[in-house]
Amino acid sequence: MKKRLNIFLLAFPLCPVFQIQAQEKPNLVFIMADQWRGDALGCLGKEPVKTPCLDQLAREGVNFTNAVSSYPVSSPARGMLMTGMYPHKNKVTGNCNSANAPYGVELPQDARCWSDILKANGYQTGYIGKWHLDAPHEPYIDTYNNHGAVAWNEWCPKERRHGFDYWTAYGTYDYHLKPMYWDTDAPRDSFYYVNQWGPEYEADKAIEYLNGHIDKTQPFALVVSMNPPHTGYELVPDRYKEMYKNLNVEALCTNRPDIPAKGTEMGDYFRNNIRNYYACMTGVDENIGRIINELKRLGLLKNTIVVFTSDHGICMGAHEQAGKDIFYEESMRIPVLISWPEKIKPKTDRTTMIAFADLYPTLLSIMGFQQQIPEEVQTFDLASVLLCGKENNRIVQPYYYIQSSNPATGYRGLRTDTHTFTIHATDGKVDKII
């Protein structure tokens, strides 16, 4: 830690990051969606999606327009976020499911997560929504996504929650119109279903948390992890679908050679899902706005860091890919918006290539805990970019795709501002360079 600190001070001697510890500790509201592409913000003008609340958040803070996910798959991305370490080191080399469970794929209980550090420093902590960092084990939880060849959903016991003392969450579950949850004290077999769209219910719970579960004289950190716009695109309230019923989908395909032709499998996959994908985003946006408005109403926003991001994007048919576990822009690029009225200059775009996992050291630094970042953290501390406007366009971010059954297999890559270089290996032997 001393080496990390000295390098930071030499590089940015006038940056106010280290003045924060003597002031009031900021609150943190960390909101993430699942599978939200980086270009899909109305304020960017690149995709015809309506996101007025996030556009306002971008105006009130920093919009990282070149943000990426280094391993664009749910569990590995979340594992890197929570630990600040890359997959080979944090052991989350693939999605947490029964197929990968024999290889130890889950968030280690002894990992030092950023939430552990905040809890140790007196923060009240809450987690709402999708977690997806525990390996399913027999007898499997009785949910629809545990009845096939691979089980996906799992409860997280208190000792594995890494400092979060309020809990309304689930492992992974994609039926968005009737989601399921475990509450803080619920045992493994006592989950419940809600007849309400997931993001709406999770915003309700966030508002309830802000009003009834915290001492407002003490700092708090709340994560709200919304599953849409993850697949199950059609599982969104009709009022959001109505907003896109007249969208000219063919116009979106113009001058896009990466989108296959109409009548092909992947071309039709894109055309059949893009309206509902945008509808999910608009619904998530509206519910994020509800949370932010409640922070304002309670007088908490001024000293609250609000983050919006996503674990990864999605190809949705582009490049002949339905999914996200690939190095293309649609998969790797994500939104990262950060506001803090007391400290962060509004209406600021940054081109520094921040990664999803860089939020661990970056947020701890701007919150005043830079000296407590563990030595094993591997990701970039970009607090200077947030607080001082020190762009760093020389950052090179890694790219991963790993077969958990054989970690020497899969893709490895490097991404610069202009290029992505990847290699594919089978049993440790390189067989493809891209």
Question: In which residue ranges do the predicted regions lie?
Answer:
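Formylglycine-dependent sulfatase
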Residues: 2-8, 13, 20-432
